[in-house]
Amino acid sequence: KNNCWCKCSIEYCVEWKIKIYENDKLWYEYIYNAKGKRVYIAMDSRALGDSLAWVAYVEEFRKKHQCEVIASTFMNDMFIEQYPNITFTTPGMGVENLYAMYCVGLFYNDDSSVNLFKNPIDPKTQTMQKMCSDILGLDFVEVRTKIKKRNVKIDPTLKQVCIGVFGTAQSKFWNNPTGWQDVVDWLNNKGYTVKLVSKEGDDYMGNKLPNGVVKHPNGPLELVMDEMLKSKAFIGIGSGLSWLSWSLNVPTVLISGFSYDWAEMTDCYRISAPKGKCEGCFNRLRLNASDWNWCPDHKGTERQFECTKSITSEMVIKELEKFL
């Protein structure tokens, strides 16, 4: 047909080469070239960890293509001063005169199959950062996202460790009933103040706080960053606070059986489920975010949350002994 528009179903970055022939003769050729042009990249997630994992690759895209990037995140203030060459805009705001537009996220069809028009590879089989890198057509290298600087006076003699015990699903929690208490007791006995920086309070979704911790008062995320920067380490689960600690270059101990040991950042002290235990449901199946007690393999049985129940306090303390 003549005089018609056409659009490719693929929505991730492909450096297209388009050739149009007439009677076997090349009539028109166009090669993708974003240099000097305006490209819009949107973060599809409100989650702290997702934003911290992904924004670095928006900058890598800008540098690769030497283009003008307009990015939308739900926490622009965290990044705007560290990425002066990116124009940050509020999600939902109109952006005009664009050469290309991409959206970073985990996309599924109604039947829970992966939307391979938006994700070039099943995102469950990739690290959180490689998933973003793939959507933006980049060669993957782990990059630590830069976030706003804090003017914090660091006392090298201060013996403080931050912990974050809560997440957005019970499967993300460290479900060993004595795990946190044993680790807090060990730290207290070594003279460390243990600062709890999770915003949730005691008995949140039936989860008790360990004794011997100092609860950081709820407030701006910047104050949590300050406490982390003062600390010798952060101990957390597969949540945004672990990504925040890692982004701040604070030694990060990450306890998770919900995901496989390759799913988050590599430069951390990672404790996973012992060999032979059920693990990695997040990297095998689509998370049902509406089911707080989602445990697709063993829900309702004695093996529910086996992955993190089987992670012992001794396993965590062994990692802490490497640098505390």
Predicted regions, residues:
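Catalytic machinery of carbohydrate-active enzymes
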Residues: K1-L324
